[in-house]
Amino acid sequence: MSDRDIRCSFCGRTQKEVKKLIAGPGVYICDECVKLAYDIIEEDEEEDVTEEFEDFVLPKPHEIKNFLDQYVIGQERAKKILSVAVYNHYKRIFMKSKITEDVEIQKSNILLIGPTGVGKTLLAETLAKFLKVPFAIADATTLTEAGYVGEDVENILLRLIQNADWDIKRAEKGIVYIDEIDKISRKSENPSITRDVSGEGVQQALLRIVEGTIANVPPQGGRKHPYQEFIQINTKDILFIAGGSFEGIEKIVEKRLDVSSIGFGAQIEPKNRKSLTQILNHIIPEDLIKFGMIPEFVGRFPVVAVLEPLSEEALLKILTEPKNALVKQYKALLSIEGVEIDFTDEALRSIVKEALEKATGARGLRAVMEELMLDLMYELPNLGIKRFTITPELVYNRGKISQELLKKLAG
């Protein structure tokens, strides 16, 4: 058979009519038919995703924020930033057909910056709950790069797959929250010559799954070895939210702002008038790089939201107002036993003050409440008391509340 007679087995074009003609056992396929076949497969995959999430209704940013408001007190700016970022992320996935072919919208992962106990994890958790997508939490401090003792980054994806009931398609549209991300900063701005097990190496390992790749996940967890089978998962549509306190980064920001503000007409605000949040709201990627995050990693988290430290008033609202407020939870638990409890305003203030001393934000509230309620939940059902008021005296005596004290206060 001459070159002139060689044709594509699918469209019939000759070798001269196409750019490439690929030969197989007794058949030929041209480059145009390869592209057409690829487009058909891609279209089918998109249809599969649409069918999998056909009941998914993308809420508007206002609706997302309204739901967050039910569980997270304060943090208005952070909630607004998150709502828009999440809306755009899922719009990019589910509305591809409405985006013109000459525009490629990249994934916008989110970085949350704020002190311990201000609601970083709760925000990510609540978003996943509202959107009804799989969710997984990872602690960056437990991760190590391949070859070192610790946890492989792929195990984060295994948790997501498990939480999606092993449905890979659902997991590929999930949310992953990585806590303590600031703890894997490298020790200096200069790239390390030696291995940095807990810093730069982990950032490099995370970078691959965060930016979008086909990851091989060991189904049993643990370290990968060459003889085991893997689950493959595409991470390009997984939303990664990273959180950290980034203690000390405000000094980097202040230094840059002070230097840049020196000049004719510059408005210099005294340092003592700037709150920590005001300073952190001026964070730029270069500040994160100076802190120890590698440039490529910073580039994969273009959306940055700063969370404010919690005031006494905010903690009081957290204690009583959200759907999952601790006071509401304990009241509901004791009501099942037929016991109605109430808290005086002074008792609530006492709980907040005790929590503030712990300097762990909303986590301090839980610690104080659990210590207070342990004895009450143990003793009250046995004492036949049907109604009980919690006072500051009980708050300050928590951990050593006796039956006699309870009877006296109930009496």
UniProtKB/Swiss-Prot annotation:
Q: Can you supply one Gene Ontology CC term for this chain's record?
A: HslUV protease complex
Q: Does the keyword Nucleotide-binding apply?
A: yes
Task: Tell me the residue numbers annotated for binding Zn(2+).
Answer: C8, C11, C30, C33
Q: Which SMART domains match?
A: AAA, ClpB_D2-small, zf-C4_ClpX
GO MF terms listed in the record are: ATP binding; ATP hydrolysis activity; ATP-dependent protein folding chaperone; protein dimerization activity; unfolded protein binding; zinc ion binding
Quick one: which residues bind ATP?
P115, T116, G117, V118, G119, K120, T121, L122
A GO BP entry is: proteolysis involved in protein catabolic process
Q: Which residues form the ClpX-type ZB domain?
A: 1-49
* Family annotation (Pfam families): AAA_2, ClpB_D2-small, zf-C4_ClpX
User: What's in the keyword line of the UniProt record?
Assistant: ATP-binding, Chaperone, Metal-binding, Nucleotide-binding, Zinc
* Listed CDD domains: RecA-like_ClpX
Q: Is the Phosphoprotein keyword given for this protein?
A: no
Q: Which Gene3D superfamilies does the entry mention?
A: 1.10.8.60, ClpX chaperone, C4-type zinc finger domain (6.20.220.10), P-loop containing nucleotide triphosphate hydrolases (3.40.50.300)
Q: Which NCBIfam families match?
A: clpX (TIGR00382), PRK05342.1 (NF003745)
Which HAMAP family does the entry mention?
A: ClpX (MF_00175)
Quaternary structure? Answer: Component of the ClpX-ClpP complex. Forms a hexameric ring that, in the presence of ATP, binds to fourteen ClpP subunits assembled into a disk-like structure with a central cavity, resembling the structure of eukaryotic proteasomes.
Q: What does this protein do?
A: ATP-dependent specificity component of the Clp protease. It directs the protease to specific substrates. Can perform chaperone functions in the absence of ClpP.
What family is this protein classified in? Belongs to the ClpX chaperone family.
Protein name in the entry? ATP-dependent Clp protease ATP-binding subunit ClpX
